[in-house]
Amino acid sequence: MTKAYTIVIKLGSSSLVDESTKEPKLSIMTLIVETVTNLKRMGHKVIIVSSGGIAVGLDALNIPHKPKQLSEVQAIAAVGQGRLIARWNMLFSQYGEQTAQILLTRNDILRWNQYNNARNTINELLAMGVIPIVNENDTLSISEIEFGDNDTLSAITAALVGADFLFLLTDVDCLYTDNPRTNPDARPIVLVPELSEGLPGVNTSSGSGSEVGTGGMRTKLIAADLASNAGIETIVMKSDRPEYVPKIVDYIQHHFRPPRHIGNGTQQQFLDLQDTELEQLRRYDVPMHTKFLANDNKHKLKNREFWILHGLITKGAIIIDENSYDKLLSKDMASLTPNAVIEVRDNFHELECVDLKIGQRLPNGELDISKPIQSVGCVRSNYTSLELAKIKGLPSEKIHDVLGYSVSEYVAHRENIAFPPQF
């Protein structure tokens, strides 16, 4: 019996729009619609993250190249986004399916209640049998609040709704050890147990996105890392054969066996693992793809932790000592107090997300700048950078004496502190 999954399918501009003519690839869009409809009939819930608004706008306005001026790009996006969702609506309506457009910027999820509202809205649409089509709101986004690319947006969307799978559809069938277009000896990478350990023997520097898109393989690796941290399996596969998605899901559910050892191992062990998995794919007649395994329940981020680490924009940094860091990681889950803070960097307001770093404290209480500083997580500070600079290193009971008021005895409460998964 097939389990019902929540599946996010991300399509880049180069998958949906011809790079030279800027015209939509209606044949690919039709295949996507057929695939999503079939997945729904199998009982799965499906969300599409669709790029292409700017590219469709370029075609509609007969503009040959994407301009550099932000206001022009946003105007083009305003034209294209409406036309793009209209095409999706037209294609899905032929199968009796309803769609809904959701345009997001980071500004829409900067508050926890907004983040929850976005999740509730998408889940309500799924419960109604509607197919949400998500895109970044390029008409309103500015560099400070944009996701940067729809690979990242798709990972955040998948984490937002607690999806089971994230499919990143692209112009290659899988990840390779090098660019297969320029290196005939490039080997396919079909299974990555632990992305945080790096990819032994893999060069991901080539390929920086297309004329009509912003992504590349690097952005897909970032998205896969985000999704894995949220407990979501990520699959990279070729966009011109979306009908393979159900077959890959079926293979993972019924035939795939995770490797016995934890992590990627040495470079040779990693490459041997690829040969073993390739044999399995051939045995079950499963098309080539790259599978990034999800973190297990013990190591995956909770929803709020993911929001703090990946949904918010960091402003400034708080540097603490290593002993204080160890206490924050302990089972008692301590909150962050002023006496743990060695130094405050850059400017931030209260409840903004701040980079948390560890450094060495000198005998006089100041930061030892000769020692390395390491980023370890993020916090939402109860105090501004100016306030915190005045109370750093002090016990909590001194806050009122120094500031004349006390917002909290903590710089950040435990629920507003998040660390990447600890292995």
UniProtKB/Swiss-Prot annotation:
UniProt keyword Lyase present: no
Domain of life according to the entry: Eukaryota
Family according to the record: Belongs to the glutamate 5-kinase family.
NCBIfam families tied to this protein: proB (TIGR01027)
Pfam family of the protein (one): PUA
Compartment list: Cytoplasm
An annotated GO BP: proline biosynthetic process
Organism classification: Eukaryota, Fungi, Dikarya, Ascomycota, Saccharomycotina
Database matches in InterPro entries: AceGlu_kinase-like_sf, Asp/Glu/Uridylate_kinase, G5K_ProB, Glu/AcGlu_kinase, Glu_5kinase, Glu_5kinase/COase_Synthase, Glutamate_5-kinase_CS, PUA
Annotated ranges, domain PUA: 315-406
A GO term from the CC aspect: cytoplasm
Residues that coordinate or bind ATP: 170-171, 214-220
Binding sites annotated in the UniProt record for substrate: 51, 138, 150
Chief location bin: cytoplasm
UniProt keyword terms in alphabetical order: Amino-acid biosynthesis, ATP-binding, Cytoplasm, Kinase, Nucleotide-binding, Proline biosynthesis, Transferase
Name under which the protein is recorded: Uncharacterized protein YHR033W
